[in-house]
């Protein structure tokens, strides 16, 4: 989609843009080479795309990882002009909306796209762009976030908390 989501695809559930889609490729259902998981919020929708929507309101998710210990889904989402964000979909959550393009990070972005922001979940952390945000200082500075796997090993335990460098709880 275009910069700033001018066609509002991130909140339109019939569009795959601005979404995290979930499908089960370990089996086939009918003529499809995949199945729609029974836990998908919109699995009974008439819209083929909407059935697959697991989360909405993302701008450009740039790596997704499942935490093997909790089942939570960690999402690094590249922002538009001012913020990068790390989002988490908790195990069992349904219909999660991360707010794009009403919000960028925790800040407002386009207030005309805030109506009907059901299921909004704020990022667990944000990184600001130094040239775009007044007072933006390390350690939470970045230009294009890239996620990675959730690490829970013993060799480097401080890698267990991917946001703050603290050992996992």
Where are these regions (language model features)?
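Beta-propeller domain segments
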Residues: 1-169
């Amino acid at each position: 989609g275009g910069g700033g989501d001018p066609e509002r695809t991130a909140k339109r559930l019939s569009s795959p843009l601005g979404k995290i889609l979930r499908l089960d490729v370990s089996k086939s259902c009918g003529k499809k080479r995949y199945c729609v998981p029974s836990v998908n919020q919109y699995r009974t929708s008439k819209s083929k795309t909407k059935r697959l929507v697991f989360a909405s309101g993302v701008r450009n998710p740039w790596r997704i990882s499942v935490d093997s210990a909790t089942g939570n889904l960690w999402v690094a989402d590249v922002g538009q002009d001012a913020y990068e964000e790390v989002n988490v979909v908790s195990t069992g959550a349904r219909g999660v909306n991360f707010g794009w393009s009403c919000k960028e990070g925790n800040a407002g972005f386009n207030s005309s796209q805030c109506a009907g922001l059901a299921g909004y979940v704020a990022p667990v952390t944000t990184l600001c762009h130094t040239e775009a945000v007044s007072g933006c200082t390390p350690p939470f500075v970045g230009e294009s976030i890239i996620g990675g796997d959730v690490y829970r090993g013993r060799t480097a335990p401080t890698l267990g908390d991917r946001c703050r460098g603290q050992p996992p709880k």
